[in-house]
Amino acid sequence: MAHIEKQAGELQEKLIAVNRVSKTVKGGRIFSFTALTVVGDGNGRVGFGYGKAREVPAAIQKAMEKARRAMINVALNSGTLQHPVKGAHTGSRVFMQPASEGTGIIAGGAMRAVLEVAGVHNVLAKAYGSTNPINVVRATIAALEDMKSPEMVAAKRGKSVEEILGK
């Protein structure tokens, strides 16, 4: 698993995985490379991309472009999550919960990279089932998309934020 971090303007880019894959044809095998990347602004915007090409740099470039085009907004609460969230994709399941200041990002592998570029600073996270990086990233993004701020919930229900929080 390789990690490369670059600053493109204000976006943080992380390379999560590069994999060699092959296509078997009559004359033998044709090798190509896949790359999984995440891109974020460190302030609640994050996206991931998966690129494939005959050469590693081209695969990484394609993945970065796809990640930039597929960014989502995440409602963060002062560097942590709004509430505990679960996400799943195929055989991967993830659970993330907010943590107090100073905890750091307690998460493994692909999930850590997504949370870092999204701007989450304190979180407790666990991946269950398959730990395939692509599926873990998709499950993490799905969980972050499902997270709603109290303001969003209040607006949907037509109530005040105080009523939602029970204050």
Swiss-Prot record:
One CC-aspect GO term: small ribosomal subunit
Keyword Ribonucleoprotein: yes
A GO BP entry: translation
Coiled-coil ranges per UniProt: none
Biological role: With S4 and S12 plays an important role in translational accuracy. Located at the back of the 30S subunit body where it stabilizes the conformation of the head with respect to the body.
Known partners and oligomeric status: Part of the 30S ribosomal subunit. Contacts proteins S4 and S8.
Protein name, as recorded: Small ribosomal subunit protein uS5
